[in-house]
Amino acid sequence: MSNKLLSPHPHSVVLRSEFKMASSPAVLRASRLYQWSLKSSAQFLGSPQLRQVGQIIRVPARMAATLILEPAGRCCWDEPVRIAVRGLAPEQPVTLRASLRDEKGALFQAHARYRADTLGELDLERAPALGGSFAGLEPMGLLWALEPEKPLVRLVKRDVRTPLAVELEVLDGHDPDPGRLLCQTRHERYFLPPGVRREPVRVGRVRGTLFLPPEPGPFPGIVDMFGTGGGLLEYRASLLAGKGFAVMALAYYNYEDLPKTMETLHLEYFEEAMNYLLSHPEVKGPGVGLLGISKGGELCLSMASFLKGITAAVVINGSVANVGGTLHYKGETLPPVGVNRNRIKVTKDGYADIVDVLNSPLEGPDQKSFIPVERAESTFLFLVGQDDHNWKSEFYANEACKRLQAHGRRKPQIICYPETGHYIEPPYFPLCRASLHALVGSPIIWGGEPRAHAMAQVDAWKQLQTFFHKHLGGHEGTIPSKV
């Protein structure tokens, strides 16, 4: 029997440690938690097809611990990466640690404790974490469980032209302060998929960035908007362009020469942006899609209600009432829904919980803030975090559905995610528990539990792509929710 490890998977990256470790024979049963056969796992890990002699499994006497990633080296942010370690002692306890610094230098970290199998190998797709930042079988846990070193920091990607680098380390032992470093590697996750074209948009009053797939067009067009933080965020649009859509990330305040506040917004600006997208030679009509989260989701509802040429809209934790400022369109005005700051609660950590602050748009003068969704001719998908503490997203989605159906409109699709907070991002972004709210002027909690929120993000990302392909043209079909 050969004592040499086979060469690693051709599409994997292997970094060898300078540290050596002796391994010894072991008499152990195979774990029932394995999802794969030993044979298929060995093919990924590059381990030999060891022959069992009686109850003794012979392993090499000395070998270097190595980290294996697939895809190798780098991949798109929304893609999973397979992580494995080989060259450990049988049943060796180890701690895996992931570290990432954002563009401002803020540190995010996660760690988990594991135990190698009888061959001294560890595959995160079949080995459960025994504790740490998470527990259980979570192959991508080291990413979605990342937490900021300092509180109130949300992971945001400002420049999609550069990747974020994740440092992965394998350390000996399970102690609170793990032992010596066994091996490490650097994994880059990019936001601009290969071949995707990035075109800044400065046409008339419109300020944004258009992302086009690498293939020949025309493509279904989507306008993408974020919330009250203002500025221009491109990372969702750039990732979505890699799925076959022409996506324009649209700024609407606090960016370049746009208004510095959103006290007054005019839908004519959004109409101009939509018309620009529809007139682009690589965008196919007859209508466009809208994608928005928070205030951006609310604006999707307003655009679909007042403007023509909108075929489909995805609203992520949006309000059915106009919030934060007055909205104008051709002589019509929507006032903002009222607020009562006396309804702010304070958490044990001293952060504000504002979920009850907004008045109901169903009562009294606040009824005038209700967006007239019954005018909309588009079809809707509402993605809802049931633990959203920014506002009552599930209530708003249900009220929009009632209003649409009462006026004979198509019933929207509503997908609700338990234990999911406000910021439903593309897959593998870590949960932001609390951060500064631009309108409130103080830190607030956003809601959500890390694992449930992470699973919701993976599902929501698939759902919105399927929805847009179905209603804007392209691949038809629906995906049953896994959450």
UniProtKB/Swiss-Prot annotation:
Catalyzes the hydrolysis of acyl-CoAs into free fatty acids and coenzyme A (CoASH), regulating their respective intracellular levels. Displays higher activity toward long chain acyl CoAs (C14-C20). The enzyme is involved in enhancing the hepatic fatty acid oxidation in mitochondria. Pathway: Lipid metabolism; fatty acid metabolism. Monomer. It catalyses: hexadecanoyl-CoA + H2O = hexadecanoate + CoA + H(+); tetradecanoyl-CoA + H2O = tetradecanoate + CoA + H(+); octadecanoyl-CoA + H2O = octadecanoate + CoA + H(+); eicosanoyl-CoA + H2O = eicosanoate + CoA + H(+). Strongest expression in heart, liver, muscle and kidney. Weak in placenta and pancreas. Keywords: Acetylation, Fatty acid metabolism, Hydrolase, Lipid metabolism, Mitochondrion, Serine esterase, Transit peptide. Pfam families: BAAT_C, Bile_Hydr_Trans. GO terms for biological process: acyl-CoA metabolic process; fatty acid metabolic process; long-chain fatty acid metabolic process; very long-chain fatty acid metabolic process. One of its GO terms (molecular function) is carboxylic ester hydrolase activity. Belongs to the C/M/P thioester hydrolase family. Its EC number is 3.1.2.2. The active site is at 294 (charge relay system), 388 (charge relay system), 422 (charge relay system). One of its GO terms (cellular component) is mitochondrion. The modification N6-succinyllysine is found at residue 470. The lineage of its organism: Eukaryota, Metazoa, Chordata, Craniata, Vertebrata. Its main location: mitochondrion. It is an enzyme of class 3 (hydrolase). The modification N6-acetyllysine is found at residue 104. It comes from the Eukaryota. SUPFAM superfamilies: alpha/beta-Hydrolases (SSF53474). It is found in: Mitochondrion. This is Acyl-coenzyme A thioesterase 2, mitochondrial. Disulfide bonds: none annotated. A motif (Microbody targeting signal) lies at residues 481-483.
